[in-house]
């Protein structure tokens, strides 16, 4: 409803509308926390050896960062297995590499170079899809049947698909 209220029924979503859609922004952050684009980030330890709590990380070591586990850590996210976009209303967290509890695109010098474009395109695309389609489950599928669990692989796929129905002929 937020999108149709802000944008209106007879207009298309524009980039300037995105800043007026806080719930959409929260849904996208929560989606990236709950279903990151990939489960891991790979980094290489530059510089000298590093010791953390009596564990030595050697220079040039490959480091695997489990961003899926960070997004499901109850010490960081209350009710981590629950999809709750509202958690971002009172929490200043972005996914642009500044907050390490939400780093789906990496951080620092190795952050995804396409992030500025992806940020705009994801918001604009999701807002346009919500604005222009009514979303419904396939016949015979109830909301209780929807399983948001992933199947592990190079990409994370949803187990039960949704059907997009155009709102305008």
Regions found by a protein language model. Name each.
Residues 1-10:
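Juxtamembrane membrane-interface segments of multi-pass membrane proteins
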Residues 11-55, 74:
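Conserved cytochrome P450 K-helix E-x-x-R motif and the immediately C-terminal K′/meander segment
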Residues 18, 47, 65-93:
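Conserved cytochrome P450 K-helix/beta-meander segment immediately N-terminal to the heme-binding cysteine loop
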Residues 31, 57-60, 83, 108, ...:
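Hydrophobic, well-ordered secondary-structure elements that form the walls
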Residues 61, 66-67, 122, 126, ...:
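Hydrophobic, repeat-rich solenoid/adaptor surfaces of innate immune receptors and signaling proteins
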Residues 62, 135, 153-169:
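C-terminal helix/juxtamembrane-tail motif
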Residues 90-121, 147-151:
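Cytochrome P450 heme-thiolate "Cys pocket" and heme-binding signature region
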